[in-house]
Structure formats: C-alpha cells, structure tokens
C-alpha cells in the first residue's frame, strides 16, 4: 500500500509541479473557502430552508423525458400509485416539484423530487417513508443536498446519496424495517399535510437545538448559526468524498 501511495504522490507531483502535500493543503483551503461562502450565502438568502408545499395544479406533474417516464412506469409496476402532486416555491419563481406514490396498504410512501439543474436537465431524488405502530418514522433517501441538522428522536433516517437506483433504495428501506422487526402501519394523513407538518417540525426543532437562529434574529444574523454552518460544511465533505451523511439514528 505504501509503494502505491508513493507512486501516486510522485505522479501528482509531476502533474502539478509542486510538492503534493502543499497542493492538497491549498486545495483543501480553497474548497473550504468556497463551501463556507456558499453556506453563508444560503444562510442570508431569502431561500427557505423548509419550504411549504401546495397542491400542484399546473398539470406539469411529471416531466416528459424518456428516462423519467421509465421511473414512473417502474413505480406503477410495483403496485404504487400516485396520490398527490405537490410543489414548493424556493424563490425567484423557481419551484420544487414533488410526486408522491403510495402502496395499496398505505404503509409506504415514495416521494419523487424533481431537481432542476444548471444545464437545464432534471435530477431525481427519492425519499421512502414508513410509519410504525410504535410511532417511529423510517426514512430512506438518496438526497445529495446536505442537511446536517437535527431530526426528531422518533425519526430513523438513512441517507444514501450515491445510490441512484430506486429499486435498491426500496430494497434497503424494507430491509431496515425487517431488521428492526418493525411493522409499518397506514398513514393517517394525506401527503400534503404530513409533509408540511414535517417541515414545521424540523424548523422548530432545529431552532430549539441551535442549528438555526430564532425567527426574529434571522434578518440580522441569517438563518443558520455558526455551529449549524460548521455541521453543513462537514456534511458537504462527507457527501462529496465519502458518499454518506452524518449518522441520524
């Protein structure tokens, strides 16, 4: 292993024309500065961290791109049906679009989030949720956006940002429930109310625990506290280079 690292170090030195530890140090500082400035800009921007959702009545419930239509057909083939199409404004007339699918027993919800990309493409992220008889909320997702905040104690969240396969994500979600010997029960509220309640709960909890500033102070100090910004910065590194988020269980 040592000789492999030495060979890589020599190759990197030849490529950059500098001593590799110095290169890595400068690169680390540049990456840190970039991410820290981006986090600070998000903190003081008008973009909501926990946007409120509304029913999507625009008719644009699912993008008509072949690769995205295949996902919809796969969901239907698994016995999942769409129960609601939602949207949330994140600023400047830009909307997050969400389509919620549910199984016949109403014990599993699959939230498909459409993320607009800078190049005009549309990214997909999935959030799978089940509620147990003990009141626990099992969440398995592949969101690539850092959260780094706090979840309620009865939320058991596993993030797998490098898993782009919905089939494998669903398999993992079911395996988690099976391993915990947890029995999923039917949802008692419709997706819109459940999602907005969850957003409000996350805002409240993260304000209480010091991840976010209290609402009256956000105009002067931004939304995210210094401790919160550090947590976000750390999670960005973990997502980008380790493919995993902080442990939330």
Annotate each PLM feature.
Residues 1-3, 13, 17, 51-63, ...:
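Intrinsic structural disorder
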Residues 3, 35, 173, 213-215, ...:
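Histidine (H) residue identity feature
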Residues 33-98:
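N-terminal topogenic membrane-targeting module
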Residues 203-249:
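Intrinsically disordered, low-complexity regions enriched in serine/threonine
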Residues 1-46, 235-238, 247-249:
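Alpha-helical transmembrane spans
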